[in-house]
Swiss-Prot record:
It comes from Panulirus stimpsoni (Chinese spiny lobster). The molecule is in a coiled coil structure that is formed by 2 polypeptide chains. The sequence exhibits a prominent seven-residues periodicity. The lineage of its organism: Eukaryota, Metazoa, Ecdysozoa, Arthropoda, Crustacea. Belongs to the tropomyosin family. Keywords: Allergen, Coiled coil, Repeat. This is Tropomyosin.
Length: 274
């Protein structure tokens, strides 16, 4: 009986010891559970913050993607604009070269016209001298014609006198006839001289009119050449202004393109940081 009691006491002590150990383990387990709960709560809080940060980062990333797409579209548009400007500039340069060539041709034509004008001026002076000579010849011809008319009247008067003398003196017939023949010959010569002088005067008038018409035509050509030269010069000035304007616009577009490129580089750097 005592042995059973001792065994029971030993078992009771053992169970009590086991109970104490179990309580200690339970307390440790509860403490560990509490610590785990605190850690889980902290992890949940951290997870919420991480999810919130991730949401913000995704939102910012979407905004950056939109900005990048817009910037790429603007860059593409600017590239097209620059290409169009370069093509316009090339066409303007071609027009400028064409206008420069035309201006050179017009200048050459103007120089040639100036040379022709000087030649015509010299020729005009020569023609004026010839016209003065012709006028002098014409005056002389008119004087000769008047003199011929006077001589003709005188011959006619003398002829009448000869005819009267012929009627009155048959014995002087041979002498009178011979003189009459001489007078007729003189009259014929005078008539031919008058006709020659009239033809010379008509030709001189025709040449004078031809010279005047030629001078008028050349003067009109010179004025037309000067007008073309002035027009070409104005066209070149307008083209030069257009080229200057296009160059300024191209510089502005390049500056805008550089600014956008810098902004894109900065955006890429920020995205790389995330």
């Amino acid at each position: 009986m005592k042995l059973e009691k001792d065994n029971a006491m030993d078992r009771a002590d053992t169970l009590e010891q086991q109970n104490k150990e179990a309580n200690i383990r339970a307390e440790k387990a509860e403490e560990e559970v509490h610590n785990l709960q605190k850690r889980m709560q902290q992890l949940e809080n951290d997870l919420d913050q991480v999810q919130e940060s991730l949401l913000k980062a995704n939102t910012q990333l979407e905004e950056k993607d939109k900005a990048l797409s817009n910037a790429e579209g603007e860059v593409a548009a600017l590239n097209r604009r620059i290409q169009l400007l370069e093509e316009d500039l090339e066409r303007s340069e071609e027009r400028l070269n064409t206008a420069t060539t035309k201006l050179a041709e017009a200048s050459q034509a103007a120089d040639e016209s100036e040379r022709m004008r000087k030649v015509l001026e010299n020729r005009s002076l020569s023609d004026e001298e010839r016209m003065d000579a012709l006028e002098n010849q014409l005056k002389e011809a008119r004087f000769l014609a008047e003199e011929a008319d006077r001589k003709y009247d005188e011959v006619a008067r003398k002829l009448a006198m000869v005819e009267a003398d012929l009627e009155r003196a048959e014995e002087r017939a041979e002498t009178g006839e011979s003189k009459f023949v001489e007078l007729e010959e003189e009259l014929r010569v005078v008539g031919n001289n008058l006709k020659s002088l009239e033809v010379s005067e008509e030709k001189a008038n025709q040449r004078e009119e031809a010279y005047k018409e030629q001078i008028k035509t050349l003067t009109n050509k010179l004025k037309a050449a000067e007008a073309r030269a002035e027009f070409a010069e104005r066209s070149v000035q307008k083209l030069q202004k257009e080229v200057d304007r296009l160059e300024d616009e191209l510089v502005n577009e390049k500056e805008k393109y550089k600014s956008i490129t810098d902004e894109l580089d900065q955006t890429f750097s920020e995205l790389s940081g995330y």
